[in-house]
């Protein structure tokens, strides 16, 4: 099965705004031209098929595909369908249980643990957020820790699910170490993402999805390929010294960079505290690496954390709806510098989603080939 490089026979560079591929750090025309447009229904079907062929049961394959397509639709390409090949590798290798028997245990009115049984993290995280939302509608606020899990993709997928259920939702996960501490000379924290979603009447949800590192690792890999220098203060060499040479990068710097990285390091620590320490899961620096390893057999025993808050149990839904509508209207109307525009968290992603509904989802050719969809 083949597809044209872009709508109406035009090239990708002629039809795709460069920011649509922003998460991969893609900024040059040659790199943008190295993608193909794929219709979402076909991309979904092929991704599901790849996971099933690797042995994943329906719940595992469905949740992973749902989370990957969330990322691909919203322009978070590093966590989109490009991860399908990695997930099939760990399913076949034995690191991930293809047929997990997840179990949850409610320990209080607003607290629970969910055992992912070493399955892919997507199904566990969706289940944890669903459980947290249900408990929050009773208790007002509820947290669910996930244990014995694996990589769950884009944290925003689960915050969005909670927001679409009408609650304020927070999701996070610690990951294997790739980020130095502020002033540190070795990897200690993962990129440790934090996502927050909130419902907005008659609008898309307010949606924050961010890593606690200065830049994503994919940005380093891209700049290495392009031979471009990195911005100052975002990465370090093997001795922990800041470097702008992507070939010398051994670790990332925390959010805030050389001068203010203590803020990002503390945020990463908060994610570790809630995802790993609170749940008894593996600490970042003790975790088997997602990649950069030959071990695709040993479970990584990752932890996640999901929190849900029901606005009905605080000031009430009517006041919440009025306040968040006014807040966002005033935010978007706030004065901007010349040539700039003001956006709320999620605005850029919703614009990407709308564009990709029109053009199809751009996928790198290697991933398209893996899914049997390359031109």
Regions found by a protein language model. Name each.
Residues 80-133:
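Active-site cofactor/substrate anionic-group-binding motifs, chiefly glycine-
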Residues 216-280, 297:
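Small-residue-enriched flexible segments
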Residues 179-247:
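Phosphate/diphosphate-binding glycine-rich loops and adjacent basic-rich segments that engage nucleotide
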Residues 36-40, 56-82, 96-107, 297-301:
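N-terminal glycine-rich anion-binding loops that anchor highly charged ligand groups
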Residues 33-43, 282-375:
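Catalytic-core signal marking the mid-to-C-terminal active-site face
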Residues 111-201:
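A generic, well-ordered mixed alpha/beta core segment in the N-terminal half of proteins
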Residues 20-21, 25, 29-54, 307:
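Generic N-terminal amphipathic, Lys/Arg-enriched alpha-helix
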């Amino acid at each position: 099965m083949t597809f044209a490089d872009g709508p109406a026979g035009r090239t990708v560079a002629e039809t795709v705004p460069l920011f649509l591929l922003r998460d991969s750090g893609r900024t040059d025309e040659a790199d943008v031209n190295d993608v193909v447009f794929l219709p979402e229904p076909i991309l979904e079907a092929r991704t599901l098929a790849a996971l099933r062929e690797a042995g994943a049961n329906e719940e595992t394959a469905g949740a992973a595909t749902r989370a990957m397509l969330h990322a691909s639709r919203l322009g978070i390409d590093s966590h989109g369908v490009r991860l399908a090949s990695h997930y099939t590798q760990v399913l076949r290798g034995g690191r991930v249980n293809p047929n997990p028997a997840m179990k949850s245990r409610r320990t209080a009115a607003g607290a629970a643990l969910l055992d992912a049984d070493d399955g892919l993290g997507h199904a566990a995280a969706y289940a944890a957020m669903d459980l947290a939302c249900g408990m929050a509608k009773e208790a007002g606020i509820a947290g669910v820790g996930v244990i014995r899990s694996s990589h769950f993709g884009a944290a925003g997928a689960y915050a969005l699910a909670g927001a679409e259920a009408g609650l304020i939702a927070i999701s996070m996960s610690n990951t294997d170490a790739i980020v130095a501490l502020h002033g540190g000379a070795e990897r200690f924290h993962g990129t440790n993402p934090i996502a927050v979603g909130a419902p907005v009447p008659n609008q898309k949800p307010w949606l924050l999805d961010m890593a606690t590192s200065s830049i994503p690792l994919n940005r380093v890999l891209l700049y290495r390929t392009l031979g471009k220098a990195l911005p100052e203060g975002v990465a370090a060499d093997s001795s922990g010294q800041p470097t702008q040479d992507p070939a010398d990068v051994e670790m990332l710097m925390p959010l805030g960079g050389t001068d203010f990285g203590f803020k990002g390091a503390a945020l990463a620590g908060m994610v570790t505290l809630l995802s790993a320490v609170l749940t008894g899961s593996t600490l970042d620096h003790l975790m088997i690496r997602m990649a950069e390893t030959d071990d695709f057999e040993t479970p990584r025993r990752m932890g996640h954390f999901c929190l849900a808050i029901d606005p009905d149990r605080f000031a009430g839904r009517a006041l919440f709806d009025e306040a968040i509508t006014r807040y966002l209207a005033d935010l978007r109307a706030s004065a901007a510098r010349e040539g700039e525009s003001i956006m709320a968290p999620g605005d850029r992603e919703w614009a990407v989603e709308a564009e990709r509904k029109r053009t199809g989802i751009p996928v790198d050719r290697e991933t398209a080939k893996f899914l049997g969809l390359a031109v």
